[in-house]
Amino acid sequence: MQVGFFILMFIIGAIFGSFLCCQARRLRRREEKKKPLGSRSVCPHCGYRLKWYDNLPIISWFMLGGKCRKCRHKIGALEILSELATALSFALLSTTINLETAAPLDYAIFAITLLLTLSLTFLAIYDGAYGELPTLCLTFSAICAIILVILKQWTLFSIDGFSFNLFLPPVLSASLLGGLYLVLYLISKGKWVGNGDWLLAGIIGLALFSPWLSLIALFLANFSATLIMYPFVRGKNKKSKKIHFGPFLVLAFVLSLTFSD
């Protein structure tokens, strides 16, 4: 059962990844006050309206060689990276719940975690593509993180009653991860990390619930960013030393949450 659930979540994640990538492009066009793409997916280069078999997550991209079926212009890597990232995130998170022993509260926590992951993935896609983090999506992610904290403490609420001490670990976690990126932002005056990065880090820290997990996420985010971005930063044609940390923070969130047990 668990293996089947893993595969199912991978497929669902790939579908959502394709959807999130499309929505990121639509939002960008609205912000730039360009003509909207419409309700149907089209090639951004020739305007070819994609058929249903052109929209199969992951499969279509590889079958077409990452190119438009009509004009053969390269589609780019954003689509396939979005689909693979969301698919793998959902598949990994499926291992955090045991379908045979899970209680209703466990399913609620799992559902909110998936919703938060979708919101964070959208932020990662948008930040990676355009270097910005939409305020509305940041706010929605923060709300999901708060709900997740409440659900995780629900059992303790019913046993011990309300206490501010119950919120101390997630608050410390958010302050630690968000605070460190805020310091980097202030020291560099926005040259190293963006204004939204420390907010995103704080939200992720809150959702991780533990200061120790925040430290692990901090290491994973910075290590992966250094590993991937170092060749670009060292290159002669570099435009900026500023790194978009959004994708790396979200990657660290999923990995930390998955292997926390």
Q: Where on the chain are the PLM-derived regions?
A:
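A membrane-topology feature that recognizes alpha-helical transmembrane segments
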Residues: 1-261
